[in-house]
UniProtKB/Swiss-Prot annotation:
Protein encoded by which gene: panB
Cellular component GO terms, alphabetical: cytoplasm
Keyword Nucleotide-binding attached: no
A GO term, aspect molecular function: magnesium ion binding
Name of the protein described by the UniProt record: 3-methyl-2-oxobutanoate hydroxymethyltransferase
Family of the protein in this entry: Belongs to the PanB family.
Binding residues annotated for 3-methyl-2-oxobutanoate, in chain numbering: 46-47, 85, 115
CDD domains: KPHMT-like (cd06557)
Entry's EC annotation: 2.1.2.11
Cellular location(s): Cytoplasm
Origin species: Alkaliphilus metalliredigens (strain QYMF)
Cofactor note: Binds 1 Mg(2+) ion per subunit.
Lineage of origin: Bacteria, Bacillati, Bacillota, Clostridia, Peptostreptococcales
């Protein structure tokens, strides 16, 4: 079993131009499969609101939701760097709130770090959490918790003025003490500049090549059917496999073809003894 990565390992990988591959996971089996496949990191994202809980966005997701799913992922991937995603409302109010909730992630869910969205507007939060001894990953570009302010789930940094803000935000996140940065739905030219400019690792989700790549597991596995982002490559169609399996099961149950003799437990005493037993209750 591979040794869990450390922040020092991730920094060394950036310097060596070695890519980091990671995915989201929200449950024990997916986390276990991801670890077996050699993923260096797993994000328990607030995207669980959409891909697991059926919400229209990430806003309704609670701390309890995130912690519960982080606990399941940690049990499934004990040797993988696990990132707890701070949900909407867990860090927006104050630095004290942010630290308190980040501590909950570390103590209750046994994550290795937390992630929060935003640049300049959350610099005091990042600083406060890191001052408390908790590693922080930043997140800029398309930030789902702020999608309403961004005009929906749209790519960011496609114009010079917006790209300038993203670059400034990236520098602020690093200066505030974050150990890494996730950039989402940003043109690769901008992402590359940020990755080259920053000393900390810069990871991409739909933002082109940099120090590593993140994808939503439900998207890459073809499980989430509401929509598929442009940047997703489907490596499987699990939804089709599961649906067909369910259909076959329904058909066999209706036709009396399941269960067969192979799928039942057989009695250990004689049939006659059981017949006597049944007679007692008639």
């Amino acid at each position: 079993m591979a040794k869990k990565k450390s922040i020092l390992d991730l920094m060394k990988m950036k310097k060596a131009e070695e890519q980091v591959a990671w995915v989201t996971a929200y449950d024990f089996p997916t986390a276990s499969f991801a670890e077996q496949a050699g993923m260096e990191m797993i994000l328990v994202g607030d995207s669980l609101g959409m891909v697991v809980l059926g919400y229209q966005g990430t806003i309704p997701v609670t701390m309890e939701d995130c912690i519960s799913h982080c606990q399941a992922v940690r049990r499934g991937a004990p040797n993988t760097w696990v990132i707890g995603d701070m949900p909407f409302g867990s860090y927006q109010v104050s630095d004290e709130d942010a630290v308190r909730n980040a501590v909950r992630f570390m103590k209750e869910a046994d994550v290795d770090c937390i992630k929060l969205e935003g640049g300049d507007r959350v610099k005091s939060r990042i600083r406060a959490i890191t001052d408390a001894g908790i590693p922080v990953m930043g997140h800029i570009g398309l930030t789902p918790q702020s999608s309403g302010q961004l005009g929906g789930f749209k790519a960011q940094g496609r114009r010079v003025d917006n790209a300038r803000v993203l670059i400034q935000d990236a520098l602020v996140v690093q200066e505030a003490g974050a150990f890494s940065l996730l950039v989402e739905a940003v043109p690769p030219e901008v992402t590359k500049f940020i990755a080259d400019k920053l000393d900390i690792p810069v990871y991409s989700i739909g933002a082109g090549p940099c120090d590593g790549q993140l994808v939503i597991s439900g998207d890459m596995l073809g499980k989430f059917q509401a929509f598929t982002p442009k940047f997703i490559k489907k490596y499987a169609n699990v939804a089709e496999v599961e649906t067909n399996a369910f259909k076959e099961y329904v058909a066999e149950v209706k036709a009396g073809q399941f269960p067969t003799d192979d799928h039942v437990y057989h009695i250990l005493d004689t049939q006659e003894e059981f017949e006597k037993l049944f007679q007692e209750f008639k």
